[in-house]
Amino acid sequence: MFRDRTNLFLSYRRTFPHNITFSSGKAPLGDDQDIEMGTYPMMNMSHDISARLTDERKNKHENHSDALPPIFIDIAQDVDDYLLEVRRLSEQLAKVYRKNSLPGFEDKSHDEALIEDLSFKVIQMLQKCYAVMKRLKTIYNSQFVDGKQLSREELIILDNLQKIYAEKIQTESNKFRVLQNNYLKFLNKDDLKPIRNKASAENTLLLDDEEEEAAREKREGLDIEDYSKRTLQRQQQLHDTSAEAYLRERDEEITQLARGVLEVSTIFREMQDLVVDQGTIVDRIDYNLENTVVELKSADKELNKATHYQKRTQKCKVILLLTLCVIALFFFVMLKPHGGGSGGRNNGSNKYNNDDNKTVNNSHDDGSNTHINDEESNLPSIVEVTESENDALDDLL
C-alpha cells in the first residue's frame, strides 16, 4: 500500500542541519536494514536523529539525577500541603459560621459540633506546620542533613524558605483567628438574653409528672407499696440520668479545656516566632551601630589628617610668601640706582685714567701710589651699598 512520506520528509528537512554529508555507499551493506538505509538516506537520517534524541534523554536524566534538589525542599513542601488543607478547612468553617449565624428555630447542635471539629483540625494542621518549621530551623542551625553538610548557597535557600513559610503560616493563622473572633462576637450578642435554668425546668417537669402519677394512683386505687416502689424506681432512673448528664458535661469540659490548651500553645508558638523576629531585628540594629562606630572612627582619622594637611599647607604658603618677598627685595636692592656711588666710581675711573697717563712719564712708585688712592676713593660707595642692604633687611624683618 502506498504511503505518502512527504510531510515526514519536510519535517526532517526543517529540523535537521543542512551541512550533513551522506556517505557515498562504498561501505558494504550486510543486511536488509543496511540496504534500506543506504538506498533511502532519510531513513538513515531518522535513525541518526532517534539515536541523538536517545543520547540527549540519557544525558538529561543523568544531569537531573546529579542536580537533585536538597532534601529540605521536600520537607518544606509538606508545609504547602498542610496550608492547603488549612485553607480548605477554613473555607468550610466560614460556611458553617455563616449558616449558624442565620436566625432560625432548628437545632444547631450538629453545626456547633462540626464547628468544633473543623477548628480542632485547623489547629492540628497549624501544629504540624510549626513542627516542620522547627525541623527546618534545626537543620539550619546544625548545617547538616542526613550526614551531609550544607553549602553556603543551600543555607541561603533554607533561610529564605523559613522566612517565606513563616509568613504564609502567620497569614493563615491570622485568617483563622479572625474567623473565630467574628463568630465569638456573634455569640456574645446573646449573652444578655434570659437563659432558662435546666435544673429548675427538670424539677418542674418532675413535679408535674409526680402530681399526674399521684392523681392517677389515687384514681386507680393502687396500693401505697406499689406507689412507693415506682417512686423509688423513678428516682433511681432520674439519678442515673443526671449522673450520665453530669459525666457528659464533664467530658465536654475536659475536651474544651484540651482544645484551649492547644490554642494557648499555638499562641505561645506565634509569640516565640515574634520574639525571634524581634531578636533578629535587634541583632541587625546592633550590627549597624557597630558599623557606624567603625565608620565614625575612620572619619575622625580622616578629619585629623585633613586638618594636619591644612596646617602644613598654611605653613608652606607663608614660607613661600616670605621666600618670594626676600627674592623680590634682593632684586630690588640689586637693581636700585645709587647716585653717590656712581659719581665716586666715575671720579675714580678718571683718576685712574689720569694716573695711567702719568705712569708713562713717571716712575713705578708714583703709579702704585695713585692706585691706592683710587681704592680709597671707591670705599664710600661700597659702604653705602652695604648700608642700603641692611636697611632693606630691617624693613623685611
Curated annotation (Swiss-Prot):
Organism, as annotated: Saccharomyces cerevisiae (strain ATCC 204508 / S288c) (Baker's yeast)
Claim: Acyltransferase is one of the keywords in the record: no
Membrane-crossing segments per the record: 318-338
PANTHER family assigned: SYNTAXIN, SYNTAXIN-16
Membrane-topology annotation of the record: Single-pass type IV membrane protein
Name of the protein: t-SNARE affecting a late Golgi compartment protein 2
Gene3D superfamilies xref list: 1.20.58.70
Compositionally biased tracts (Acidic residues): 386-397
Topology, Cytoplasmic side: 1-317
InterPro entries named in the record: SNARE, Syntaxin, Syntaxin/epimorphin_CS, T_SNARE_dom
Summary of subunit composition and partner proteins: Interacts with VPS45.
Localization in the cell: Golgi apparatus, trans-Golgi network membrane; Endosome membrane
A cellular component annotation (GO) from this entry: endosome membrane
Phosphoserine modification, residue list: 109
Keywords: Coiled coil, Endosome, Golgi apparatus, Membrane, Phosphoprotein, Protein transport, Transmembrane, Transmembrane helix, Transport
Function: t-SNARE that functions in transport from the endosome to the late Golgi and on the endocytic pathway.
Bias kind Basic and acidic residues: ranges: 353-374
Similarity comment: Belongs to the syntaxin family.
